[in-house]
Amino acid sequence: MAIARGDFVRIKRPESYWYNEIGKVASIDKTGIKYNCTVRFDKCNYAGISGTAEGATTNMFAESELEKA
């Protein structure tokens, strides 16, 4: 089955901060870019954005790096 917007997925990219974590697909880009799936998570990563203490809660992944949860 193909991954669709709104699906909950497990991250399978070993070097990712969110490896083996579950997130929700926010969007899928169909233009042919490599990392076409935007995935949203409940927790923040370690990198602050624009001088704030909070980190990112989204990241881009290829469909091959995701599996349905």
Curated annotation (Swiss-Prot):
Subcellular location: Cellular thylakoid membrane
Keyword Thylakoid among UniProt keywords: yes
Keywords: Membrane, Photosynthesis, Photosystem I, Thylakoid
Gene that encodes the chain: psaE
Gene Ontology CC, one term: plasma membrane-derived thylakoid membrane
Main location: membrane
Protein name according to UniProt: Photosystem I reaction center subunit IV
NCBIfam families: PRK02749.1
Residues spanning the signal sequence: none
Pfam families assigned to the protein according to its UniProt record, in alphabetical order: PSI_PsaE
Its membrane topology: Peripheral membrane protein
Function (record text): Stabilizes the interaction between PsaC and the PSI core, assists the docking of the ferredoxin to PSI and interacts with ferredoxin-NADP oxidoreductase.
Entry keyword Membrane: yes
